[in-house]
Amino acid sequence: ALAVLATMLMGAVATAHAKDCAGATPLPADGTITPPAGDGSADLARFSGTWGGTWTARGGGDGPCGVLVVEDVFANGFARVVYSTGVADPLIAQPQAWRASGRVVDGVLRFELPLSWRPEATYRFAGNDLAGTFKDFATDATTTAVRIADLRRVACPRLPPVASPSGASRDRIVAAEMLSPSTRPGGLVHNDYFMPIGTTTPARHALRGTLTIHDAKISHAHDGCAGLDVPAAGLTAAVFTRGEHLVPAVRTIIRPPGSRAGLILSPGRVWSEPGDRGMSRASFPYVVVDETSNGARNGLATFLFDDTRVSNLRVQVSQETMEWSRDDFWGQAPMTYAPGPIADEARLRTEFDAERRLETPMKPWSALPASKTTRWLDAFDGDAVPDDISANGVVIDGVLYVKTCHTRAGPYPYCRQMRHGVFSVTKTLGAAVALLRLAQKYGDGVFDLKIEDYVRVTATHDGWRDVTFADALSMSAPVGDLGPRRDWPQPDPDENKPKFYEWLEARTAQQKLDRGFTYGRYPWPRGEVVRYNSVVTFTLAAAMDAYLKQKAGPGAHLWDMVVDEVYRPLGIFHEPTMHMLEADGSRGIPLLGYGLTPTIDDVAKLTTLLQQGGRHDGVQLLSAAKLAEALYRTSATGLSVLRRSRYGDYRYHLSFWSVPYVTEPRLRFLIPFMSGYGGNFVVLLPNGISAFRFADGNTGDIETMILAGEAIRPFCTSAPAGAPPQGSGAAPGGGGVGGG
């Protein structure tokens, strides 16, 4: 999917200047060009300003307009730029823009886009114009960019901002719009329009049957700049009403035929409004997930219904954990309804009642039980930009305190049901939980089992020899291509590289394993150096699944065990995750290196389980000894990843990162946390509090979350039963700690 997107970023484009690029590209509303200071050279100052043209790929064809805005250029050659592209039907449906930093060296301005695969652009002068190149693993394109005097000429017209309902009656998404086959929504509306407005009453009708959503064209935009309509594949879903709730019968990933995207439907609401022509109204939240990555887009849907018919379905998407494609979608799709029985209906109704009964209590951020007002509660998110954050908060003594459930169209009205693509947080909430459950069932010795005894290793080297389940979970298998020195400055040199993206595209388990085993061998033994790679976690998932089948029979499935024996006892009845799709269409093994889309309610339940040592309602669900080790509550401290915090090295062990922290009484802790691509964090604090932030702005500092948690409840006082032990010892003098 990312390789496809990379191609779309530049595409195959026409001869430079062949199209009118006026109003074709999005530009930041706060964009400004600062005249170069007098202490810089004239050669550097020439780059300042706005430049535009169209791109030409090696293969020819029509493609996008491109705009470069050099906002600042400094005397040392560093520059701040905005890079923007328009649409090119049919390959590039969405204009996009990025801010980036670059540098002019030997007359060439070079910068990388802030995307995981780091595509590179260069510009150099060719007469009075700029000759540009764009390169990544999928694209090689050139352009001739001319100077544009007026920045406003190239900026696309912005869609109007959303506004919340202003009166006591509905003036958006009204019945006439919903019932008309020709309605074309003009853009996003405020999320409140998907919920009851004005005087409402209980639903006049009930739903029990099958909804069929038909194929449609959906509009979309990036940063208020409209793109081309895109096709949305239809699907069929059984639903029923339960009191004021609308409940989908299937809560796993639904993949419409021929679509690379999947959908997860969640429970919504039903009610009646006086202007709905005697019909009832429903809305529900859903999430769109990708076929190969863990990106997730949160949407809302609404429709009218009576006992026999439904209106069109109005949908919109206005938030995501998908930093490479932060776009809005909206539209209306035809829909039909067939009343009738639902398979396993009695169980589904009973299960939904239990799900609601076991919901984690939720309170607003303002209700935090802090002992005194502190700046750290306000600074909880550190340098994370609010628009980048989907949801954030803390879990205290089994209660959720939520700071925000944010979208670009207003607060998400189904905050509890909002799902988040958490990427590598899955390595803990998926892979580690699975191995800890196996250890509780079959003994802690499963951590010492060898990968090669359960997976056919096709590597041409001995790097996998004697690698244990624990080594794989700790990312200390001596396997990889890049970062060949022990002192390599980044622990994940192979992630987000061309070979990794080829591995992502593999559909079946065997294809994925075979591609993973093409990685080379490092010159050190297992268990000594962290080389973080999701390929290793997937190999562990395959080994764990094979081990479970050996113990429980060929019909056993690793993720079913996790859901049935860990998640469901906690009250998490639905936790869809990404699986391999085998050649016969059957569900394969779970990926577990990424793929989970948890809600904040799920996170509250799971972090509470971890904070309580793997015990729930008097039953030990996870191995207590191995969980304590994973949470840095024993003498085991894992391996340094050669990244420093102000108190020492970050470390990694059994899927948990840790950062050293020293309290004011000079007690030293290793704070365990989970980290996922884009800025997804779950932090387990030593006072029993857990903090979370799901975002896609690539911000990585969690210290403000730790400081806020300590402000709520000091780390050096007694925590509730089941919370971790207190400080692990006094820190040495000098204000810092060494070596983790």
Question: What annotation goes with each model-predicted range?
Answer:
Residues 154-298:
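Noncatalytic N-terminal accessory/assembly modules of large enzymes
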